[in-house]
Amino acid sequence: MKVKGRVVRGLLTVMAIKALLLSPRIVKAAGPPDTNWMSYNGTVNGQRYSPLDQINVQNVASLTEVCRFKIDDSGTFQAGLVQIDGTLYMTNAHDTLAVDATNCTVRWRNVYKPEQEDVFQINRGVAFANGKLFRGTPDARLLAIDAASGKTLWQQQIGDPTVGEFLSSVPAIWQGLLIAGTAGSDWGIRGRIMAYEQESGREVWRFNTIPRGKELGADTWKDPNSARYGGGGSWTTYTLDMASGEVFAPVGNPAPDFVPSHRPGANLFTDSMVVLDVRTGAIKWWHQMAPNDGLDLDLAAAPMLYWNSKGHPMVVMGSKDGYLYGVDRETRKRVFATPVTTLKKAERSPDARGVYTCPGPVGGVEWNGPAYDQMTKQIVIGSVDWCATIKSDEVEFQPGKLMLAGKWDWDAAKTGWVIAVDPDSGAVKWKYHADSPVVAGITPTAGGVTFTGDMGGNFLAFESATGKVLLKTATGGALAGGVITYALGGKQYVAITSGNVSRLSFGENGKPSLVVYALAAGGQAAATTLATQTATPAGAATAALPPDAGRGMELYGKNCAACHGNKGEGVSGPALKGVHSKLDFAATVNWIENPSAKMPKLYPSTLDAQAVADVAAYVMGL
């Protein structure tokens, strides 16, 4: 009887355990574990793939806005977002911010005060390592910031802004080192890539992207004098192979941009991917896309590493020339070159008559490159479809001045693409034609959904396997930076940058804002218009205070200099020097408020009436 009693008690215990395990509280599906987005492209190999699947093909249409935070009233917002342990880190030209990743509450804000005049007010984000954030500045400083407090730990001048050098890219992180490069190709700098100690900012090594003297590649500059100001800057972050200790760096265009005859030869290492030993900076190999480029077709986005179906290590690059290039890392041979936008190559180099080319100088693949979808085994890339007529001019080198030696006229129409490509052959698997340029980050997920956005302000979600649009929702501002996903507290989030003014801008640009999405309770679909993103009433077109040219200079730098030049010398937009001899103050205000179709419309959503008056006052003094 004792044995029988023990058996009965045992059976009852088993039944009780089963009942407990089957109770609704226990069997309810657990949310995903907390996950971070550690770097500009998520991982150092550049793949941007997320293993999260709470948001999937079946429910992505029910994404809704959780919160948003306006980081500034105007200007560029192209930063790649980073999320570490519940905090989102982001930047604009001068500010670094830490924001709660679930409710957009600001934790701290670090404001950098330039020590010299900015070259170009742009920044692409921060790198994170050992509790520190690292970023560059428009006056060529490298900063280390405490991630917990926002306090600046050290800063190091690593370039000379008086000759056009600045830092727009996110440093790469490798075993106590920071790898960063100077931007400023179009100003006629001599580009270089450098490594610095994370603890002190001390330089460890450097590699000159424009070789001279006995350096490898110097013979590709047939006129050695032209290499003094040959360009070759770095616009964006680098990619790392942690196992081999290699850094894959995209290198920008040669200078002058539009007169290749001034610099005969292949002009290494411009428009190239260079592979360096991360320990020493020694070059291992390179792949050049556009020798002796005369159309500003630089490599502006980070390469991406993956393995093809045959087990070969591959590197893929999206270029401003409109191609996606796949290169076998073992043979160092090109495997495919797939067009990812409209192609119409100019038949000759630019001249005073002008040459028509597709893509134009701000077309093709811009600062966010290809992603790799591990679920569908495909590469996904966004691009800009925008043609232009380029005219060359006299070459004049003045340190610190733009050295385009020409200008361009855009086509009125500009669109974009999101394209999925077979990683073995480069064959196109599907494509989506967007109504506006696509430059935002591409993020595939294990939920079978790929996220991105366009410069028309649309946040997009695709079915990864087919390219079917599952969600298209207005954010109130152009998407030009990070699109990332992470999980906190059992919930998957998607965070984006919305609101940007740049040479790719048009229409309503919106105010630079962080926007965070998650699945809505009850499956409510995301709204296609946002009441929280309101514009200044059109009738409020009178400045309340006298125009302030000093404030106007600051606003001009954020919103106008990309097209018109820091000093109004003209870039892709017309020169504004001496505009006071053609327009009075009222006419200048009217021109800003009612621009041509080729200009961004900044009023009233980005600049209010007071800001317009301030900018007009500054422009009148150029």
Describe the role of every protein-language-model region.
Residues 10-23:
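Bacterial N-terminal signal peptides
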Residues 30-71, 105-114, 151-160, 202-210, ...:
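Aromatic (tryptophan-biased) beta-strands that constitute blades/sheets of beta-rich domains
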Residues 34-41, 74-94, 118-142, 166-190, ...:
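Repeat-blade elements of multi-bladed beta-propeller folds
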Residues 55-58, 99-100, 145-146, 196, ...:
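Hydrophobic/aromatic beta-strand positions that recur at structurally equivalent sites within the blades
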Residues 145, 191-202, 266-281, 332, ...:
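Beta-propeller blade signature
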Residues 246, 453, 495-499, 547-549, ...:
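Extracytoplasmic electron-transfer domains, predominantly the class I c-type cytochrome c fold
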Residues 484-533:
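Blade-level signature of beta-propeller repeat domains, shared across WD40, Kelch, NHL, RCC1
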Residues 531-555:
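Electrostatic cytochrome c docking/interface patches
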